[in-house]
Regions:
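A structured binding-face within diverse protein domains that lines the active/interaction site
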Residues: 102-104, 121-124
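Active-site glycine-rich loop that binds ribose-phosphate moieties when present
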Residues: 138
Length: 203
């Protein structure tokens, strides 16, 4: 198995083999599949992200879900090792932030338990839902706070994504998204790592 460093390097090389037009076309397929998932359709609050040039493009999906009346929350990097979530209320709420990508400048969002579905990018994913990030740990800290659902059938079957735990708090369903070449046989992981409940890669 490749180490995390080796796998990140390999994925970066694969990304360089694709043009922006090719990545945008793949993104359309991937987000199209996401939009058809029952858990996305039924969700009240969805966490998404504003994509880097080498990530699955998400702005069209953000616009559509916002137009459908869903609450959209987006990450904002606030330090070298920390991000927070902000509410999205249209493109006027976006400004150029860290890494040169658009970030939200709306109201801070801290009710993590209210997030029904979180769509998470990554450098690589595997069939067990293991995720390899860029190495900064931004999403790892969020995932630790968001809770674990761990039942993949919830999303695919259309069963109530808005089910609550006995204590009244929600249980965020985590979907990893990536390009097909980022879906690998195995991602280095340990028992303490957060796993995705589903991975959508366009295959």
């Amino acid at each position: 198995m490749l180490t995390k460093t080796e796998l990140r390097k390999a994925v970066r090389q694969l990304k360089k083999q694709h043009t922006q037009e090719e990545l945008k076309a793949l993104s359309t397929v991937i987000t199209g599949k996401l939009l058809e998932l029952p858990c996305i359709k039924d969700a009240d609050t969805v966490m998404l992200y504003c994509s880097l040039p080498d990530e699955v493009y998400t702005m069209d999906m953000i616009h559509r879900l916002h137009e459908e009346g869903k609450k959209i929350v987006l990450p904002k990097v606030i330090s070298d090792c920390e991000m927070e979530l902000r509410e999205y209320d249209g493109d006027a709420d976006l400004e150029v932030g860290s890494f040169g990508i658009m970030e939200p400048c709306g109201n801070p969002f801290t009710d993590y338990e209210d997030i029904d579905v979180a769509v998470i990018p990554g450098m690589a994913f595997d069939k067990d839902g293991n995720r390899l990030g860029r190495g900064k740990g931004y999403y790892d800290r969020f995932l630790n706070a968001a809770g674990k659902r761990g039942v993949n059938e919830k999303c695919e079957s259309g069963k109530g994504v808005n089910e609550k735990l006995e204590n009244g708090k929600g249980n965020t369903y985590k979907i990893g998204i990536c390009f097909p070449f980022q879906f690998v046989d195995a991602v280095p992981a340990n028992e303490h790592d957060n796993r995705m409940d589903m991975v959508v890669c366009g295959q």
